[in-house]
Amino acid sequence: MSTPSRSAALFERAQKTIPGGVNSPVRAFRSVGGIPRFIAKAAGPYLWDADGTRYIDYVGSWGPMIVGHAHPEVVRAVQEVAADSFSFGAPTEAEVVMAEEICKLVPSIEQVRLVSSGTEATMSALRLARGFTGRDLIVKFEGCYHGHADSLLVKAGSGLLTFADTTQNAPSSTGVPEDVVKHTMVLPYNDVAALREAFARHGKEIAAVIVEPVAGNMNLVRGSNEFHQAMRALCTEHGAVLIFDEVMTGFRVALGCAQALYGIKPDLTCLGKVIGGGMPAAAFGGRRDIMGFLAPLGSVYQAGTLSGNPLAVAAGLTTLRLIAAEGFHDRLATQTRKLVDGLAEIAREVGVPFAADSVGGMFGIYFREGVPTSFAEVTKSDVGRFNAFFHAMLDQGVYLAPSAFEAGFVSSTHDDAILDATFEAARKAFKAV
C-alpha cells in the first residue's frame, strides 16, 4: 500500500477543521484503510490526485459523470451560463426546459420539482406521499439508502454499512429519535412474501413504499421482476404511493431509467446525479394529482433557495442531450458488461472466489461465490479480500469505490483501451488477495 505524501498532508490538515477530514464519510477510506486520495483534477475516464498520480476512475463522482469528466460541451454550457450570474432565486426558462425534458424521457412523471440533493428529493417525496394519503407508515428495504433524512436512517446502505449496526431495526445513526423511525417498516430486499405479509397486516396504514429498483448502496443488487410487479400491485390495491428512488439509476441504466427496464410505472420518482451533470441537482416528480399537493398549490410544503440553480440546470440539460444520442446506453451497457465479465474471468484464472454483475452503466463486484440477491447475501462477501484488491488496484492506477458495499460506474469515455489497462492491473491485484 503506497502513501501519497501530498494527500496524506492534506488529510492531516483537513482533520483539524473538517470532522474526520472529509465532507462525506465514505471518502475517508475508513472501510478500506489507508489515506484517501485528494483529487486535483479530472478529464474523461481519469482522475489526478494532489500528488499528480493518474487513476482510471470507476467512481465517477458516485454516478453523475456518465459522459466522462469535464466533457467539453458540458463545461462550455456551464461557462456560458455563469457569465450571466450563478443564481437568481427566481424562475428561469432553463428550469422549465429541464422539467419538460424529464417529463418527456420518463413517462410516469407528469410534473416534477427540482431540488439540490438526492436527500431533499426522497425526503420531499415521502412528505408528499404522507400528505397525499393521510397516512404515516413508510416501507423501505434492508440495505437501500435514500439519503440521510431521519426516517430513512434504519438498516440503510452506503456509508452506514461501514459505520453503523445494521442488524437491528433501530436508527442507524445517533441523533435519530426512536419515535421517528417507528413509522418506518424495514423489509428484506427482493422478499415478495414479506412484502405481501406487510400489506396484509398494515395495508391501510402504509403511505408509501420507497425502493431502489436496482440497489446501488449495498453494492449492486438487482430487484427481481416479481419483486417490482408485487410492489406495484400491492400499492395500487391498498392506495399506497410507490416511490422509485432513481437518484443513482436514473438515466444511467437506461434513458427511461430503471422503470423503463422493468416496465413499471411508479407513482413518484426521485432523480439526481446524472440530471446535474456533476453539479448539485436532483428532482422528484410523478402523477399530477399527487404533485398537486405541493405548495404553492397544496398543503405539503417544500422549498429551496438553490432549487433549479442555473449552472446545475445547464450541466444537466447538456448531459441529458448527450446521453439521448442513438445507441448511447447500448454502448455503455456493453462496455460495462465487458468490464465485469473480464474481471470475473481473470478471478477464475487466479482461483479467487469472485462474482460480478452490471445493469446499464452500473456494476458490482463481490468477493464471494455467486451474485447476491439480498442484503443478507451481500454482507457475506469477503470484505478483507475486497480491501486488499482495492489497494492493489489503487497502487496500479485504478480508482474503485472505497467500500465493498458501493456500486461502481462506467462512463462513455471508458473505451476498450481503458478496459485493457484495468484488466492488466486486475491480473496483478487478484494475485495479491
Curated annotation (Swiss-Prot):
GO biological process: protoporphyrinogen IX biosynthetic process
Record's subcellular location: Cytoplasm
Pathway info: Porphyrin-containing compound metabolism; protoporphyrin-IX biosynthesis; 5-aminolevulinate from L-glutamyl-tRNA(Glu): step 2/2
PROSITE patterns noted in UniProt: AA_TRANSFER_CLASS_3 (PS00600)
Domain of life: Bacteria
N6-(pyridoxal phosphate)lysine PTM sites in chain numbering: K273
Catalysed reactions, as listed in the record: (S)-4-amino-5-oxopentanoate = 5-aminolevulinate
Protein name: Glutamate-1-semialdehyde 2,1-aminomutase
Record organism: Ralstonia pickettii (strain 12J)
Taxonomic path: Bacteria, Pseudomonadati, Pseudomonadota, Betaproteobacteria, Burkholderiales
